[in-house]
Regions:
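Short active-site neighborhood of thiol/selenol oxidoreductases, capturing the structured segment around
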Residues: 79-102, 108, 121
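Extracytoplasmic
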Residues: 64-66, 85-88, 116, 141
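Short, ordered coil/turn segments that flank beta-strands lining enzyme active or ligand-binding pockets
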Residues: 74-76, 171
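Hydrophobic alpha-helical membrane segments, chiefly transmembrane helices and signal peptide h-regions
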Residues: 7-18, 89, 126, 140, ...
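Thiol/disulfide oxidoreductase modules built on the thioredoxin-like
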Residues: 135-142, 150-201
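Structural microenvironment flanking redox-active thiols in thiol-disulfide oxidoreductases
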Residues: 102-140, 150-156
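N-terminal targeting signals for export/organelle localization
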Residues: 1-68, 72, 201
Length: 201
């Protein structure tokens, strides 16, 4: 009796195992990694168009033009030559591994939200990984245009080896001021814009 029962159960178990082994489960899409996510930053195309409400800069003494240097945009698209950037503009050079850079980024984001077409806020991510920049952009809600300088060509051209670095550019594309004093806050940024670009925020 037991032997007969075993003969009946063995084929049934084999059939069940065969169904389990050969049945194909539908593939589930892999979760998107940070590198595959859309860029948090804005496109760079508007950087070569003058801000709609910009007025001629009258404060202070004009300096050198921005360097003849072409940088890629974080979002892709056409690279941007810094000589083609239309001011007034505030350029923030930063890296994800730099604590003062991370500290001041929210102030630059708020500044970009208060620009009202009078000036541009531009980021230059330098000596950094793309993933690091993407993570900070997402975590801090930074969405102004971002250029990539994976070396330090921009800083070398300015002869300023500092992080963070802020560059104020007038409507004629000339550098009015560079600041390497550390993390800037809202009040300090507002004071710099009024003093060097004649813009109140």
């Amino acid at each position: 009796m037991m032997r007969r029962l075993a003969y009946l159960l063995v084929p049934l178990l084999l059939a069940t195992a065969g169904c389990t082994a050969t049945a194909e489960e539908p593939e589930r899409p892999a979760p998107a990694t940070r590198a595959e996510r859309p860029s948090p930053f804005a496109d760079c195309a508007p950087l070569t168009v003058a801000p709609a409400a910009a007025s001629p800069t009258s404060a202070g003494k004009a300096g050198d033009q921005l360097p003849d240097l072409t940088l890629n945009c974080f979002t892709g698209g056409a690279p941007v030559n810094l000589r083609d950037v239309k001011g007034p503009a505030v350029i923030n050079v930063w890296a994800s591994w730099c604590p003062p850079c991370r500290k001041e980024l929210p102030a630059f984001q708020r500044l970009s939200e208060r620009a009202d077409g009078r000036f541009q806020v531009i980021g230059v991510n330098s000596r950094d990984s793309r993933g690091g920049a993407q993570s900070i952009g997402e975590d801090y809600g930074v969405d102004f245009p971002m250029l990539l300088d994976q070396g330090d060509a921009f800083q070398r051209a300015l002869e300023r080896n500092a992080f963070p670095l802020t560059v104020l550019v007038d409507a004629d594309g000339r550098i009015r001021h560079t600041d390497a004093t550390g993390a800037l806050d809202d009040a300090r940024l507002a004071a710099l814009l009024e003093r060097h670009l004649g813009v109140r925020v």
